[in-house]
Amino acid sequence: MPIVTVKFLEGRSDEQKRALVERVTEAVAETIQANPEKIHVVLEEMRKDHYGVAGKRISDQ
């Protein structure tokens, strides 16, 4: 049972998240010959003030 976690900044539409789940599932199924019914995709949206790069929060840039 593959479990894939995708972390990204907030702001994506439901349509984008739906497409992401579908495409990640397809890629994993094809790459490791896994049954798509057994593939789990976890989406973790991060607030821009909860993520930083180069010492600065994304929300402050």
Swiss-Prot record:
EC number: 5.3.2.-
InterPro entries, sorted: 4-OT, 4-OT-like_dom, Tautomerase/MIF_sf
CDD domains cross-referenced by the UniProt entry: 4Oxalocrotonate_Tautomerase (cd00491)
Catalytic residues in the record: P2
Pfam families according to UniProt: Tautomerase
Keywords tagged on the record: Isomerase
A GO MF term: isomerase activity
Keyword Isomerase applies: yes
Top-level division of the source organism's lineage: Bacteria
Family the UniProt entry places it in: Belongs to the 4-oxalocrotonate tautomerase family.
PANTHER family: 2-HYDROXYMUCONATE TAUTOMERASE (PTHR35530:SF1), TAUTOMERASE-RELATED (PTHR35530)
Protein name as annotated: Probable tautomerase BH3814
